[in-house]
Every structure is written in C-alpha cells, then in structure tokens.
C-alpha cells in the first residue's frame, strides 16, 4: 500500500465486528496514511457518528450487531454534515439484495470479503481524489 494521496489528515470510520478483519483493515489503512476510528458494533458506530466530525471516508460492514450497516448507512445519509462522506459497504456474502439496498440508500461502493488489499486501496484512493 502506498502513502496517502494528499498531505492533509485522512480519517476513516471503520465499523467492523469481526476482530481479525478489523485488525487487518486498521493495519492496511494506517500504512496508507489514514487515522482509523474503529467501532466494533453498530451502536458504538452510531455513538461515534454523533460525536465526531465527518471523516474522509467510512467503511461499514453490512452485518453488525445491534444496528446493521444498512441502518447506519441510512442514519448517516440523514445527517446534513455527513452527506458528502463517501461510504463503502463491506459484506461477507455477495447477496445482491443487500448490495442493491446499500447502493439505493446512499452507499458509494461495496466490497465482498475477503477482499484484495490492493483493490481496497485503489477504491479508497479514488474517493479521496474525488473529494479533494
């Protein structure tokens, strides 16, 4: 993974309940220059969303305990100050209905786990470039 594409601070909210996946993502993202704010469940993510300024990007697992990624996505899209934040959904299975719902609700992209780290990096960089 290369360094971040711009000099300003890149913050990413990661909502992922699977510990191994979260550790891998935090490592990859930190190497890419991101400051990662991690929530291990949907309720924790909602609390963080209410308390933090909008990040550069959001990665949401679709299947989270307490509040699903789809519920969080809808919640984020209702917050005016978060409207511009790119959101990538992560899913353990390629259920077309969930993917369609996510895109219709306001997700910018999705990735099926297990994911290719280089592909994830490329997708994130694409959204960072668009935002800059």
Can you describe what each PLM-predicted range is?
Residues 65, 83, 95, 113-114:
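The feature encodes the CheY-like receiver
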Residues 108:
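Short, glycine/charged-rich "phosphate-handling" switch motifs in NTP-dependent
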Residues 23-31:
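Charged docking surfaces used in two-component/phosphorelay signaling
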Residues 16:
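Conserved acidic carboxylate
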Residues 38-57:
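Acidic, metal-coordinating helix/loop segments flanking the phosphotransfer/catalytic sites
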Residues 115-125:
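C-terminal output helix
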Residues 61, 91:
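Active-site residues of response regulator receiver
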